[in-house]
């Protein structure tokens, strides 16, 4: 996983960043950008994503970290659009997308998840700068 992150920074100039709590520098998870490479009509777009350990959910850390990543992208890169997606069942992540100002585009079946799996159906959001 670490090597994939390093490779993406080297090839794309962006990747995932560690998220830590300010008070004690506890590692909480990550946020950042990722090149979308699986077979969908928005492939070759850039995804903004986040993943935090369960004990940090619901405390505002994900929107805070994602907002910082959005601001960096807007002010320090030439990237003009970001996507984000999650399973329809992951309402917490979808709320983060809404809180950071992303617009819902549509639903889609994730091509890497079997069609009968409950996590197959996803929701897609984007934001343009």
Regions found by a protein language model. Give the residues of each.
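Acyl-donor (CoA/ACP) binding surface of acyl/acetyltransferases
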Residues: 18-129
